[in-house]
Amino acid sequence: MNRFIMANSQQCIGCHACEVACVMAHNDEQHVLSKRHFHPRITVLNSGAQNSPVTCHHCENAPCALSCPNGAISKRDDSVQVNQQKCIGCKACVVACPFGTMEIIVTPLDNGSAKASAYKCDLCLTRPQGPACIENCPADVLMLATPDVLDNLAKSRRQRTARLEAQPWHSEAVSEETAPTKLQQMHNTPPRGEPDKLAAEERVGHFNEIYLPFRTEQARREASRCLKCGEHSICEWTCPLHNHIPQWIERINAGDILGAVELSHQTNCLPEITGRVCPQDRLCEGACTVRDASGSVTIGNLERYISDQALALGWRPDMSGVSSVGKRVAIIGAGPAGLACADVLVRSGVSVTVYDRHPEIGGLLTFGIPAFKLDKSLLARRREIFTAMGVHFELNCDVGSDVSLSQLQTDYDALFIGVGTYRSMKAGIPHEDAPGVYDALPFLVGNTRHVMGLDATANEPFIDTRGLNVVVLGGGDTAMDCVRTALRHGAAKVTCAYRRDEANMPGSKKEVKNAKEEGAAFEFNVQPVELTLAADGKVNGIRMLRTRMGEPDAQGRRRPVPVEGSEFVMPADAVIMAFGFNPHAMPWLESQGVNTDDWGRIIASVESRYRYQTSNPQIFAGGDAVRGADLVVTAMAEGRHAARGILDWLEVSVPKMH
């Protein structure tokens, strides 16, 4: 008989560790570069409370092999294997497979064509340790079925039956003493613990952070809830930085904060930042195995706890083993992408100088995110840490004005551009440039500069909303930042108006909840048609249409459909437009041969020969300037990938990235 993977579905906890392990086993034990390459050869199906790992059965007289017109599927080493050289991607095997475990993967080729190939479990035939899914299953529900294994399994079941039959028929059922299974641990996990939070009536009076740090007992309790779902867990995969989450949570359990912070910094140079501002509910916590049973582990607050504790103890990155490789790189933009790139480069012995137009590092972390979400002293401390590591900062320096890109190309071996996106998207409705109408980003930047005691700028003035009736248009996290900022400046009323329903808001549920607690009003299913003006030309309201939810769009979100005859005017003294951002104009790029797309985004890809290299070989780019406005962690991940591309291009030999 052929060998195959056998699963005990009754004990499966649905952690998907087998899927992650499978993909990594076929990618040199590294995470794949993007989600579109995540093709596990084993899949965990969920049907209510039951989880079932499913993969190829390696059938005797396999229908897939019998159906293949090119002889690409055959028996080898007691298993059914696909010869990729012979496969023509015809899908005959997909149709023939009775279990639906065959898949066709289309891979783009360098010449512009594509190769379609059959894809299935190969039992990790070339892997010395055997199938990765079995090795990494934390619940031990997978095994490699062979004739000997099946014989032993049948024998053990017969022996158990014999033991039970030896008991008197009127006796109580005999249960054998065994250690708790992972499934039992999951069902016995205590409820999720949230951090303490300042009362709403207190926090609206200042710009201090509203969440209090975990106390040690809170952190230990929350860390104990982690099931440690494999060496490379699904929470690790869904984090764009692939943080070693279960491993540093385990160090918290052991009371080893310094060990935890070392693990944390292997993949993330700003953990005290991402622990505060990352939308964990959409990433790591959203994938947590115990989410449905008792609530996700509070990963973000544990990440914050580790860094806050370790940095308070005096921990700093150890650079004693780093020696210079004689290369110099300039980084344009001290935001998340630029800082992440600088971290990898300086740890690899490269001399790094970071240029930024702002007076402090962080980019929108510092000037776009309000202080009640992110204390600005954290970035100042992190600048001191980077400086001690050897990174040099040129702040208040605008590339293109204060220094030319061509000069930087002359002075440095390579350049990285991580300038973010600063141009606000418009709604395209009448009077959106009238007095009293503000774009979200200049509003937030002007406020942050005011809170930090910095002078206002002409393009980012401080807007005082005291006593005003403020309406914020939009439903993302930036809209919530504007709502909560206006409330703290004493606005008489603040309303968030969004064209879809609450369930389809793109922002964090936590931020919406906080805004409601602080007194914000919400109007859902309303779409702006026109801004109305007073006699003096200043905005005094928004003409709206009611909407209903229609069919899903290309991204799967239901479209808002205007309701005929539902028009009304919403009064407003100030209107803040929070519709997102596009890349701002960078004319100095084109002169150096850096191509951009129709939206103004720099064209660069993680799948290039040198990751995130642009059309100018000396220049690399990443973050929002490449992909458009996105998350802090995605920008950081791209900065790290670009650093690897730069190191490869400069022929600097470094160990594999964690």
What are these regions (language model features)?
Residues 463-500, 563, 568-574, 581-582, ...:
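Long hydrophobic segments that form regular secondary structure
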Residues 190-196, 200-212, 242-253, 264-265, ...:
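Beta1-alpha1 glycine-rich phosphate/pyrophosphate-binding loop at the start
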Residues 2, 28-66, 84-86, 92-209, ...:
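Flanking helices and flexible, charged tails adjoining ferredoxin-like Fe-S electron-transfer domains
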Residues 5-21, 25, 48-71, 81-100, ...:
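Cysteine-centered iron-sulfur cluster-binding motifs in ferredoxin-type domains/subunits
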Residues 395-409, 525-537, 548-550:
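A conserved short coil-to-beta-strand element within the FAD-binding core of flavoproteins
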Residues 433-467, 552-629:
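FAD-site-proximal beta/loop scaffold in flavoenzymes
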Residues 248, 273-274, 282-332, 347-348, ...:
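FAD-binding core/adjacent interface of flavoenzyme oxidoreductases
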Residues 482, 625-653:
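A conserved FAD-binding loop/helix module that cradles the flavin
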